[in-house]
């Protein structure tokens, strides 16, 4: 499966081969943007920043 990540304006942010890759990208994004909120669940965090994701096989 491939995970696709989009920001709040549906601009494509990246494609990831695994959920862990997508989570790592989000962790780097949080660090770069000085976001100090806790990310317990990847999908809840994506929702909290108003981003979107999709999966293709």
Labelled PLM ranges:
Residues 1-10, 21, 29-31:
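Short aromatic-glycine-(Arg/Gly/Cys) micro-motifs in beta-strand/loop hairpins
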Residues 29-57:
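Short, mixed-charge low-complexity intrinsically disordered segments
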């Amino acid at each position: 499966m491939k995970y696709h990540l989009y920001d709040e304006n549906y601009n494509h942010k990246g494609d990831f081969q695994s959920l862990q890759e997508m989570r790592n990208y989000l962790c780097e994004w949080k660090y770069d943007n000085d976001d100090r909120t806790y990310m317990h669940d990847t999908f809840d965090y994506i929702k909290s920043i108003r981003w979107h994701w999709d999966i293709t096989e």
